[in-house]
Design a protein with these regions (language model features):
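Compositionally biased, intrinsically disordered low-complexity regions used as flexible
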Residues: 1-2, 189
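Bacterial N-terminal signal peptides that target proteins for export
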Residues: 2-12
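Coiled-coil-like amphipathic alpha-helices with heptad-repeat character
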Residues: 4-5, 20, 83, 300
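Carboxylate-rich, polar loop motifs that coordinate divalent cations or form catalytic acidic clusters
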Residues: 10, 27-393
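Bacterial N-terminal signal peptides
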Residues: 13-21
């Protein structure tokens, strides 16, 4: 097999050491939700070609780190890890690492993208940061500037110019994207929305039709439309019932055992007797397809789809490789990619494709991040690195 990025693989081997040492210097809290490592050996994971000869993978290692976000920016690929932000230039296989030494307030990067033209990073404990690409300096925004919490999971620029920021203490709305005007910062919480926002831990954001903002939280899905809040949880159809998934729950390390926060959630749902990682109210991933349907990835309750009237849930019995959904991504061609705890699958024409796993070339079976290039190449992030899938090549 011809590997186009063999030079980059060598530079990434060097970078792995950089990231490991960076992680030692700046201790980043463990990722949330907990991560299960792939069981594949290094040999199985390295530059493996898919069984389908039309599909090719190249692996880029980043050491003992999670890849939590990827952003394809023309010829540049930005990779957010638990050990810093990597900028990779596909034109010459060069890379640069941004971390605490570069001006970031945290090495844990959970969001990377462009907001109002600026390279933007949401971090794990370091707030929101914008990169001045000419000077290489970071402009940081944290709680004193109006941010609800220092833990930032997602950022969305709405068509009306407002910027929404998902945090662990509610969701910020910056009117007109005026970050330097404190009066433009608003924070929505469970308390000040009177329960309209079902939980203050917000993981995902997306703008739907007519400017509707959708939010994925630890207490279910929320919708903000024309100043009004609505929400859905398991009792309103979100996530598959435990009886449907109980025999296919991979993670036995229930967060409720170690966290009073999660234990209380399960108690409120009547799930105290369920001693595995299952909480269908806990929505980790969110995407909206071309039809306007809303997709929600749950913690053990499979994948749920809202068509404007009701929620329908899909599980391993319907073709998913796993019931813990970590990432949802809409490809250039409109195909929905679903990253799970047991591989990667697509949804198109009302059915799931055959799953891709480490046996087919994925770096690991846990898929945490995805991004597409203009040519519809797919970059897939997992624990330890990124797999570059060149579709149709």
């Amino acid at each position: 097999m011809s590997i186009k990025h063999s030079k980059f693989r060598k530079t990434m081997a060097v970078l792995a050491g950089v990231l490991i040492s960076a992680g030692a210097r700046a201790q980043v809290p463990p990722s949330h939700p907990p991560v299960a490592l792939s069981g594949a050996s290094a040999t199985q994971q390295e530059a493996k070609m898919a069984a389908n000869a039309a599909t090719k993978f190249t692996h880029f290692r980043v050491g003992s780190k999670n890849v939590k976000s990827i952003f394809v920016d023309g010829a540049l690929v930005w990779v957010g890890t638990s050990g810093g932000l990597v900028r990779y230039d596909t034109r010459d296989d060069s890379y640069k690492l941004f971390d605490g030494k570069s001006g970031l307030l945290s090495n844990g990067v959970f969001y990377v993208g462009r907001i109002n033209g600026r390279l933007t990073v949401g971090t794990y404990g370091g707030g929101l940061s914008f990169l001045d690409e000419r000077s290489g300096k970071w402009n940081n925004y944290n709680i004193p500037e109006g941010l609800g919490d220092a833990f930032v999971y997602d950022v969305v620029a709405a068509k009306n110019g407002d910027v929404w920021i998902a945090t662990w203490s509610g969701v910020n709305r910056v009117i007109g994207g005026a970050f330097d005007d404190r009066s433009k910062w608003h924070l929505y919480t469970v308390e000040n929305t009177k329960g309209g926002l079902p939980n203050d831990w917000v993981y995902g954001l997306a703008e739907g039709r007519n400017g509707v903002i959708w939010l994925a939280t630890e207490g279910g899905m929320a919708r903000f439309a024309k100043g009004r809040w609505d929400n859905w949880n398991h009792s309103r159809g979100l996530g598959a019932p435990y009886e449907k998934v109980k025999d296919s729950i991979e993670f036995k390390n229930d967060p409720g055992r170690a966290s009073s926060h999660h234990a209380k959630q399960k108690e409120e749902m009547g799930l105290s007797n369920v001693d595995v990682a299952f909480n269908p109210n806990y929505v980790i991933a969110l995407e909206i397809d071309r039809n306007g349907d809303v997709w929600a990835g749950t913690w053990g309750g499979g994948l749920s789809r809202y068509d404007g009237k009701r929620w329908v849930s899909y599980t391993t019995s319907d073709g998913l490789p796993g019931n813990h959904i970590f990432m949802l991504h809409l490809g250039v061609d409109g195909k929905l990619w679903i990253g799970t705890n047991s591989g990667l699958v697509t949804w198109q024409n009302e059915k799931f494709s055959k799953p891709l796993t480490v046996a087919d070339g994925l770096f690991a079976n846990n898929v945490f991040a995805m991004a597409s290039s203009a040519a519809d190449d797919l970059w897939v992030g997992s624990y330890g690195g990124v797999a570059h899938l060149r579709l149709g090549k």
